């Protein structure tokens, strides 16, 4: 079997696992279920500097170079941050409320007519569906607020368009796949440069939030739950649950598990966008740095979030 077809089979398997787990999670919504509240001490305004240079890309460890310095958010964008953005963007007209959805303008992609390619013309596209029971945002009295307890959890149920619009608002952007992978793996310096996980060569239940990892949020049954606060796996003890400090070599947290992360690449001949990092609903093997998934840019899920680069 060629590497190309083996890679396709792995991607199909990952997609099927995500779909199956998503169906399992779609029980009766209990949006009022109490959520454990822990202070991780995360400074969600913090950025990590990543210098130009080489790193090992992919499962087959190909040396690749990025020719520019850049920065990425240390933590995933939170519900609290996204609510503040929506209030500003709604006031300035950057986004609009239409039939219980948040939409915004996108300039469109070049359409090349490839098989299965979907045309994305200039126009308004879905950012967030406000009536989804998995969403932890509320719109009351002309303002967005966060459902209590979810303020510092990663923003989820946001499409690629909605993630990109957040970054654009502040003159940032979504990271490319290569930028994301280097931030997760670290430099080509001979010190575990081929690590499969952001923190090293092995994974334990105390490293990240993934399927059956037994964190304090694992038993929550309401649809859309089971994310952990950003930066949760920082070496602290929460009740009886002791975490391992699991940042990447550049100091980024949640680069494996919790939620899949949108990346910014727009590839020719296809409309799909790519996600990295695995999530609370995937097995530990899908938290390896090189694992990719894809979805239409209008896709949203309780297991998908994002962070920005600049």
Where do the PLM segments sit?
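A short glycine-rich, aromatic-capped structural motif
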Residues: 41-124, 157-161, 257
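Bacterial N-terminal signal peptides that target proteins for export
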Residues: 2-15
